[in-house]
């Protein structure tokens, strides 16, 4: 089942952390991890003006995979997570009728 989720990832301080993380996320390795969790073409990103954090709205098809990735336990992503990520929060999104 597909679920809409929101992720807020805060970066560790340091020069080039955002660029390094985004470079990995767009690499073949990063894209493989992302595709195993969510529909990449439906991802909506947003970046803080100072690049200290990034937000993603995701269409998740593998919630357990997202939890593994967000907790830093995905074996493929662990090195970049350990180097770049300070904290991650994940929320489920619900539509509101207006």
PLM-predicted stretches and their roles:
Residues 10-25:
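Short, surface-exposed ligand-recognition loops at beta-strand->loop->(often short) alpha-helix junctions
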Residues 4-12, 55:
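Active-site-flanking beta-strand signature of metal-NTP-handling nucleotidyl enzymes
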Residues 94-98:
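Short, low-order "capping/linker" segments at domain edges
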Residues 48-50:
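Residue-level recognition of beta-strand termini and adjacent short loop/turns
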Residues 46, 55-58:
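Hydrophobic alpha-helical segments with strong N-terminal bias
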Residues 9, 42-45:
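Hydrophobic/aromatic beta-strand elements that line small-molecule binding cavities or substrate pockets
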Residues 24-43, 59-93:
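An amphipathic, aromatic/His-enriched active-site/gating alpha helix that lines ligand/cofactor pockets
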């Amino acid at each position: 089942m597909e679920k809409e989720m929101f992720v807020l990832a805060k970066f560790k301080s340091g020069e080039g952390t955002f660029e390094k993380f985004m470079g990995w996320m767009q690499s073949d390795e990063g894209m493989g991890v992302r595709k195993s969790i969510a529909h990449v073409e439906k991802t909506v990103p947003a970046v803080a003006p100072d690049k200290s954090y990034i937000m993603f709205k995701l269409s998740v098809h593998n919630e357990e995979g997202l939890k593994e990735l967000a907790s830093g336990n995905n074996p493929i992503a662990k090195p970049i997570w350990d180097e770049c990520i300070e904290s991650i929060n994940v929320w489920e999104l619900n539509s509101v009728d207006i």
